[in-house]
């Protein structure tokens, strides 16, 4: 089965993605989430793409080991190729019935090999757990790479010290090997003493900089990165250290076509409601990392994805100016947006303007729907909605004191008083990018249809471009 732009193996879901670049083809291994009881275990499935637009499902490639096996759940890992052309897959082996001394289930590093990246042979004799000093229940997401300072191999993974402050034991542990089978611990790659742990770590080089990418759920559920001139650190925090918001998690990357492409999952919500709690796993999506002059990374939708929506649907014929220094103003188009559409807009605003918004799937009054709101004074963009959560029958029984989807905000420099906005909407999936540098992704359910519009609060703005495009 082939899907366009996004991928989900319906009726199931995509968990963590493990990208591997195989020439011009990207092999995207992913944790297959079935959400059935009794649980079916977690296998690796494979989907491939050669253009970031069309995704071809290849099915299961690394099965669950079965009810009694150490790898009943085959969780996140990585793939590398050795000097002889053999491929090595490292993954997290877990069985809820096999417990550590503290009563939590053990996590182990397991190994498999292949000659074609599709048929994998497991090597249970190579499985190993956490060494002394590390928590045996947090030993996951192995990422293997050739040691840039030597002739061997390094393996980093999400780990925790066995002692210390409960919420700050997280460490990116590191092991080394000469043969890709026997591993010995060495000094951690990064020991920030800040997070519960740093999930799905990966390391790559771009130009003169090295980047350490990880996902965390301590301060926020988000994928972050650090940067260094050396693969050993020190690891510096850029001003904007996140890849996306709460709705795009466990992002990992591969080099493709001379570019760095990240793949994560847009999180789903319980009962497919905007008020439903976030769930693990969702729909696969891609973002491209672009290196700025100072080494920091901007993120945007790949051009191939945007170009997949090239059939004109609506075009704003003349600039639209709106606003007032003392009130809110909005304007809404007449036609209902298609369910699968790209929106492109250019906005400019006067100094001191408080809010500039793109209304998405809104009603004719611009009242009910979703809002991508730019807030220059706060240097942020947020995804909002109306109505917010209703918890009673009275007029004031709404979450009016919750200013937006609280997890869905991104820092952004809006001092230039202009913004280029790219929005992709495909059924319940929403992916926004401002100035081709800051992205915000989400699943949205409560407003399945509506119009596009613009709004301004306490100031004035001009929309110089507003176009919508259908899939080609």
Task: Enumerate the predicted regions with their spans.
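Extracellular glycan-recognition regions
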Residues: 2-5, 36, 243, 257-260, ...
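Beta-rich carbohydrate-recognition and catalytic domains
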Residues: 1-141, 145-200, 205-245, 266-322, ...
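Beta-strand scaffold of nucleotide-dependent catalytic cores
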Residues: 263
């Amino acid at each position: 089965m082939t899907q366009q732009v996004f991928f989900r193996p319906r009726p199931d879901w995509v968990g963590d993605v493990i990208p591997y670049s195989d020439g011009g083809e990207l092999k995207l291994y992913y944790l297959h989430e079935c959400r059935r009881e009794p649980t079916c275990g977690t296998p690796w499935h494979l989907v491939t793409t050669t253009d970031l637009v069309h995704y071809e499902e290849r099915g299961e490639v690394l099965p669950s080991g079965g009810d009694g096996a150490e790898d009943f759940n085959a969780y996140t890992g990585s793939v590398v190729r050795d000097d002889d052309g053999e491929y090595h897959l490292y993954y997290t082996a877990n069985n809820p019935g096999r417990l550590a001394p503290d009563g939590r289930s053990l996590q182990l590093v397991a190994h498999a090999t292949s000659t074609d990246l599709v048929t994998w042979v497991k090597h249970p004799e190579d499985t190993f757990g956490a060494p002394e000093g590390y928590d045996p229940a947090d030993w996951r997401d192995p990422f293997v790479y050739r040691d840039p300072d030597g002739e061997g191999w390094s393996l980093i993974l999400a780990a925790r010290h066995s002692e210390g402050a409960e919420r700050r034991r997280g460490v990116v542990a590191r092991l080394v090997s000469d043969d890709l089978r026997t591993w010995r611990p060495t000094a951690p790659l990064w020991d920030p003493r800040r997070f519960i742990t740093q999930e799905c770590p990966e390391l790559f080089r771009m130009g003169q900089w090295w980047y350490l990418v990880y996902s965390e759920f301590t301060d926020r559920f988000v994928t972050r990165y650090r940067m260094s001139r050396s693969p050993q650190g020190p690891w510096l925090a850029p001003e904007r250290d996140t890849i996306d918001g709460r709705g795009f998690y466990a992002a990992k990357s591969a080099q493709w076509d001379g570019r760095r492409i990240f793949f994560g999952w847009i999180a789903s919500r319980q009962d497919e409601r905007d008020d439903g709690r976030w769930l693990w796993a969702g729909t696969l999506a891609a973002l491209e990392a672009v290196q700025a002059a100072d080494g920091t990374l901007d993120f945007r939708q790949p051009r191939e994805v945007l170009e997949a929506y090239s059939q004109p649907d609506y075009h704003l014929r003349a600039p639209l100016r709106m606003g007032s220094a003392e009130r809110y103003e909005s304007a809404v188009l007449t036609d209902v947006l298609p369910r699968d559409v790209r929106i492109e807009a250019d906005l400019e605003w006067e100094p001191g303007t408080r809010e500039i918004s793109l209304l998405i799937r809104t009603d004719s009054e611009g009242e009910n729907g979703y809002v991508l709101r730019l807030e220059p004074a706060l240097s942020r963009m947020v995804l909002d909605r109306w109505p917010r959560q209703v918890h009673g029958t009275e007029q004031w029984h709404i979450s009016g004191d919750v200013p937006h989807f609280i997890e869905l905000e991104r820092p952004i420099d809006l001092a230039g008083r202009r913004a280029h906005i790219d929005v992709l909407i495909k059924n319940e999936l929403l992916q926004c990018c401002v100035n081709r540098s800051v992205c915000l992704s989400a699943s949205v359910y409560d407003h399945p249809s509506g119009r596009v519009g613009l709004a301004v609060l306490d100031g004035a703005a001009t929309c110089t471009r507003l176009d919508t495009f259908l899939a080609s």
